[in-house]
Amino acid sequence: MNEKNIKHSQNFITSKHNIDKIMTNIRLNEHDNIFEIGSGKGHFTLELVQRCNFVTAIEIDHKLCKTTENKLVDHDNFQVLNKDILQFKFPKNQSYKIFGNIPYNISTDIIRKIVFDSIADEIYLIVEYGFAKRLLNTKRSLALFLMAEVDISILSMVPREYFHPKPRVNSSLIRLNRKKSRISHKDKQKYNYFVMKWVNKEYKKIFTKNQFNNSLKHAGIDDLNNISFEQFLSLFNSYKLFNK
C-alpha cells in the first residue's frame, strides 16, 4: 500500500469536547484490550488508555507514531506499532475490541480485514456517512458479506466540522458486534457465489423461474429493492435446497 496516499487521506479530530461526545457512545471498561487503527496524533489514544486495560495503536506513519508516544508519555499501558493495518496479524488467542477513525479511501479494505481476519467481539469505527449507509444496504455485496458475521449499527453522526482538514461530507460512528456466523463453514463458498449473482441481478443463474417465485413467496418478499437480511438468508437457504 502507498503510505503517502494513506497519510494524505487522514482527517483528524483533536477537540477534547468533540472526542468526549464520541466516546460516550463507545462501551469500554478497565478490563478491555483495544487495538486502535491509526493513532493519528494520539488524541483518541489518550482517551482510550485512560479507560482501558491496554491499547495497541497501529499507525503507518512513523512521524505520527512518535507524536502519539510523546502525547502518552505519562502512561505505560500502551504500545504504538509502525505497521500497515492491512498487513497486520491480529492475535487469535485473546479477547479485544477495535476502534478506529479510518481513512475514507481504504474503508472497505479495512472493514473486510477486521471482520474476517480478527476475532474482535466489538468494533467501533468512524467512517464516512455514505459508507455507513452502504453497510446496511442489502443490495450491496459488502453489506451481505458483513451481515453474516456481525450486527451493524450507526450510533451517531460525526459532523464534518469536527475534523481538520475538514472533509466534504459528514461521518458516522458505527458499531459492529460479532455474532455466531450465519453461514456454516462448508457453505461459505456457495454463499459468496450466491451473493455476487444476486447483487448483479443474475437471478437465472441461481434459480429457475418457478424456484425464484417460490423462494420469494417463502421469504415474504414483495419488493426486490427492499429486503431484509433475514429474507436474503431465506433466499439463500432455498437456493441450497434446490442445489443439493
Curated annotation (Swiss-Prot):
<feature type="binding site">
    <location>
        <position position="84"/>
    </location>
    <ligand>
        <name>S-adenosyl-L-methionine</name>
    </ligand>
</feature>
<keyword id="KW-0949">S-adenosyl-L-methionine</keyword>
<feature type="binding site">
    <location>
        <position position="11"/>
    </location>
    <ligand>
        <name>S-adenosyl-L-methionine</name>
    </ligand>
</feature>
<feature type="binding site">
    <location>
        <position position="13"/>
    </location>
    <ligand>
        <name>S-adenosyl-L-methionine</name>
    </ligand>
</feature>
<dbReference type="Pfam" id="PF00398">
    <property type="entry name" value="RrnaAD"/>
</dbReference>
<comment type="similarity">
    <text>Belongs to the class I-like SAM-binding methyltransferase superfamily. rRNA adenine N(6)-methyltransferase family.</text>
</comment>
<dbReference type="GO" id="GO:0000179">
    <property type="term" value="F:rRNA (adenine-N6,N6-)-dimethyltransferase activity"/>
</dbReference>
<keyword id="KW-0046">Antibiotic resistance</keyword>
<keyword id="KW-0694">RNA-binding</keyword>
<protein>
    <recommendedName>
        <fullName>rRNA adenine N-6-methyltransferase</fullName>
        <ecNumber>2.1.1.184</ecNumber>
    </recommendedName>
</protein>
<keyword id="KW-0489">Methyltransferase</keyword>
<dbReference type="InterPro" id="IPR020596">
    <property type="entry name" value="rRNA_Ade_Mease_Trfase_CS"/>
</dbReference>
<dbReference type="GO" id="GO:0046677">
    <property type="term" value="P:response to antibiotic"/>
</dbReference>
<keyword id="KW-0614">Plasmid</keyword>
<dbReference type="GO" id="GO:0052910">
    <property type="term" value="F:23S rRNA (adenine(2085)-N(6))-dimethyltransferase activity"/>
</dbReference>
<dbReference type="InterPro" id="IPR001737">
    <property type="entry name" value="KsgA/Erm"/>
</dbReference>
<feature type="binding site">
    <location>
        <position position="38"/>
    </location>
    <ligand>
        <name>S-adenosyl-L-methionine</name>
    </ligand>
</feature>
<dbReference type="InterPro" id="IPR023165">
    <property type="entry name" value="rRNA_Ade_diMease-like_C"/>
</dbReference>
<dbReference type="GO" id="GO:0003723">
    <property type="term" value="F:RNA binding"/>
</dbReference>
<feature type="binding site">
    <location>
        <position position="59"/>
    </location>
    <ligand>
        <name>S-adenosyl-L-methionine</name>
    </ligand>
</feature>
<dbReference type="InterPro" id="IPR029063">
    <property type="entry name" value="SAM-dependent_MTases_sf"/>
</dbReference>
<dbReference type="GO" id="GO:0005829">
    <property type="term" value="C:cytosol"/>
</dbReference>
<keyword id="KW-0808">Transferase</keyword>
<dbReference type="InterPro" id="IPR020598">
    <property type="entry name" value="rRNA_Ade_methylase_Trfase_N"/>
</dbReference>
<comment type="function">
    <text>This protein produces a dimethylation of the adenine residue at position 2085 in 23S rRNA, resulting in reduced affinity between ribosomes and macrolide-lincosamide-streptogramin B antibiotics.</text>
</comment>
<feature type="binding site">
    <location>
        <position position="101"/>
    </location>
    <ligand>
        <name>S-adenosyl-L-methionine</name>
    </ligand>
</feature>
